[in-house]
Curated annotation (Swiss-Prot):
GO terms for molecular function: DNA binding; DNA strand exchange activity. Keywords: DNA recombination, DNA-binding. Gene3D superfamilies: Putative Large Serine Recombinase, Chain B, Domain 2, Resolvase, N-terminal catalytic domain. The lineage of its organism: Bacteria, Pseudomonadati, Pseudomonadota, Gammaproteobacteria, Enterobacterales. InterPro entries: DNA_bind_recomb_sf (IPR038109), DNA_bind_recombinase_dom (IPR011109), Resolv_N (IPR006119), Resolvase-like_N_sf (IPR036162), SSR_resolvase (IPR050639), Zn_ribbon_recom_dom (IPR025827). Encoded by the cryptic lambdoid prophage DLP12. SMART domains: Resolvase. This is Uncharacterized protein YbcK. Residues 3-163 form the Resolvase/invertase-type recombinase catalytic domain. The active site is at S11 (o-(5'-phospho-dna)-serine intermediate). Residues 175-290 bind DNA. GO terms for biological process: DNA recombination. It holds the Pfam family Zn_ribbon_recom. SUPFAM superfamilies: Resolvase-like.
Length: 508
């Protein structure tokens, strides 16, 4: 008996509940009854909810596995492929669609379209009528998909425009703390869930970890947004804390952002203030733990993740801390004999960078250049967004997406950090002189707060422990080059040096 292989596909997951799949199966069963000299292979290729318009099914779906099986000889010549119609194989542009058909036929695989019982084989490539028919079917399928795609895009474009101009709701889909009103024209917050959100933000502002917050909610039998008790987890809380819908913003997906679709402010009803939301983001985006289990405050590294070794790029760590002794900053690669840079006294570095620069950072920027600081961050945000957009485009053609996805994740984190810094700069400016000098650097809470402020103020600090100098990159765009660490440069001296700044850089 001859072997037949079935391929079934539909484009939208919503079609799963429709008749598309049953119809295709019915056509295959009816054909096999009439053609009793064929048997159906146990392997059936199905792309359920995968579009053929852009060829996704041929890149990552079951159809791509079918093509690989043909090219590697796992499916032998003389096999027949059963499909409902040619548009199941491709809805791409005519040239690409015909090439896919030719690829199958040239490997000795016959194709039978069950809707019209047409047989395509290798001889069909030399028959004008068969080829023209296939081209016309491919052309029609592509045009239908183009029209559907255009209609959907125009529909969503109008919905987004209406949402921007008048706040019209685009879809009933909304965050779990909201619901549609009876008229289906506005979103209404759930009072109990809003109280839960406020509690979570309060706990986070107390600098509790995500696990500690989850434990608190579970211990107090606080229901999650599915109505279940003791079901909170740290990942759910992390996503909630970062959700801009809490301050009324509708955020498009990665891919939508890559196509230039922007956020819609005021789309959802606000349930917390901007100040509270962005204050929590500063905690969330800092790449260090919320609390140190040690009782010795001096073990808290004020420049953690910020200060890097000039020789190898690794983040500097603290060493030989005991009691009230500050110890040293050292490259972690030194103990592994992979970096030969010496350690440097920590008290010298901290005094020069923390007491003189960080505590006076509001003055390390001429008033007339405040706009430039905003522009620097805005340009950085645009550059990061363009990099993300380019990687999103690469995702559609790259065979290995894991590495690209990781790059997008890291860039997105950097983008969010820059966005929070810009928001802080525009809304509150940099913390005032008195705010900084109220910090108690001998206490655990004071040092943790100082560490967060340093992370927010300095983009990075590149330290050369041989020369006892460093390059300091401020988040506002200013750069101090070769800043000395063995002698004290007062804040006033550093501020006075701003008059010699060229292209945002000052050399010491």
């Amino acid at each position: 008996m001859k072997k037949a292989i079935a391929y079934m596909r539909f484009s939208s997951p919503g079609q799963m509940s429709g008749d598309s799949l049953n119809r295709q199966r019915r056509l295959i069963a009816e054909w096999l009854k009439v053609n009793s000299d064929y048997y159906l292979d146990t392997i059936t290729y199905e792309d359920l909810g995968l579009s053929a318009f852009k060829g996704k099914h041929a890149q990552s779906g079951a159809f791509s596995e079918f093509l690989d099986a043909i090219e590697h000889g796992y499916i032998l010549p003389g096999t027949t492929l059963l499909v409902e119609s040619l548009d199941r194989l491709s809805r791409e542009k005519v040239g690409e669609a015909i090439e896919r058909l030719k690829l199958i036929l040239n490997h000795g695989i016959d194709v039978i379209t069950l809707c019209d019982n047409t047989v395509y084989n290798i001889d069909s490539l030399n028959e004008p009528y068969s080829l023209i028919k296939a081209i016309l079917i491919a052309q029609r399928a592509n045009e239908e998909s183009e029209i559907k795609s255009s209609r959907v895009k125009l529909s969503w474009k109008k919905k987004r425009q209406d949402a921007l101009e008048s706040g019209t709701i685009m879809t009933a889909s909304c965050p779990r703390w909201l619901s549609l009103d009876d008229k289906r024209t506005a979103f209404v917050p759930d009072p109990d869930r809003v109280k839960t959100i406020e509690l979570i933000f309060k706990l986070r502002m107390e600098r509790r970890s995500l696990n500690a917050i989850a434990k608190y909610l579970n211990d107090h039998a606080v229901k999650n947004f599915s109505g279940k008790e003791s079901a909170w987890g740290p990942s759910v809380i992390e996503k909630l804390l970062a959700n801009k819908a809490l301050i009324g913003i509708c955020v498009p997906s990665y891919r939508a952002r890559g196509k230039g679709i922007s956020e819609i402010a005021g789309y959802y009803p606000r349930v917390i203030s901007d100040d509270l939301f962005y204050a929590v983001q500063e905690i969330r985006l800092a790449p260090f733990g919320i609390s140190n289990s040690s009782k010795n405050p001096m073990l808290i590294n004020l420049l953690r993740t910020v200060m890097k070794c000039e020789a190898c790029g690794n983040t500097m760590i603290v060493h030989a801390v005991s009691g009230s002794l500050h110890g040293y900053y050292v490259c972690p690669m030194r103990r592994l004999h992979r970096c030969d840079r010496p350690s440097i006294k920590r008290d010298l570095v901290d005094y020069n960078i923390i007491n003189e620069l960080l505590f006076n950072c509001s003055k390390i920027q001429p008033v007339e250049n405040k706009k430039d600081a905003n522009e620097t961050l805005e340009l950085k945000i645009i550059e990061l967004q363009m990099k993300i957009n380019n990687l999103i485009v690469a995702l559609s053609v790259a065979p290995e997406v894991t590495a690209i996805a990781e790059k997008i994740r890291l860039l997105d984190k950097e983008l969010r950090r820059a966005s929070v810094s810009l928001k802080t700069l525009k809304s509150k400016g940099v913390n005032s002189f008195s705010d900084f000098y109220a910090i108690d650097l001998t206490s655990k809470n004071g040092r943790e707060l100082c560490r967060t402020l340093a992370y927010k103020t300095f983009e990075k600090i590149i330290i050369n422990t041989d020369n006892k100098t460093c390059d300091i990159y401020f988040m506002n765009g200013i750069v101090f080059k070769h800043y000395p660490l063995m002698k004290v440069i007062s804040a006033q001296q550093a501020i006075s040096a701003l008059k010699y700044m060229v292209d945002g850089e000052i050399y010491f």
